[in-house]
């Protein structure tokens, strides 16, 4: 799903909440009334915009013909630049969704992360690539992980011994990142399960 404007997000949230509360979507007239539009036609324009962005499907010929598209139907979310201190999968980090079958990766991918930098180039993870990530904290030494150190997110190979974690690059021009778990905040966000070369699937 492409990023929504503030007004489109209000319409989307109203539809979702209405379905949750009543079991059915609102009519155009109900949307217009709730959000202060002058006419149902204004609501219709916002619905068309939501459909173009992949957030909903409009079923023609029905006053309540609105269907929210699930994450599975939208595809895997693509995470771009992550703001400090915010959840990785926060809506504002999602650049879009790509129709990639999660089951083509083992274990299944939960999201795609846009790679920034060349610290993992020796194993074929390049700047701008899309890294397929399985969301888990169950990881082992030697695996390539997505980790958060304090507020920074990075992709590195994991080496943990006692209270010390080393995040190893796959590029001799970069140094390992050493984390003292007694002094720094450290979280595993997921396990790298595959890579899509930049532009290959887009």
Curated annotation (Swiss-Prot):
Task: Tell me what reaction this enzyme catalyses.
Answer: Hydrolysis of Ala-|-Gly bond in repressor LexA
Q: What EC class is this? A: hydrolase
Any GO BP: DNA replication
Q: In this UniProt entry, which residues are annotated as the site Cleavage?
A: 84-85
| Assembly notes | Homodimer.
Return the similarity comment. Answer: Belongs to the peptidase S24 family.
**Protein name per Swiss-Prot or TrEMBL:** LexA repressor
| Source species | Klebsiella pneumoniae subsp. pneumoniae (strain ATCC 700721 / MGH 78578)
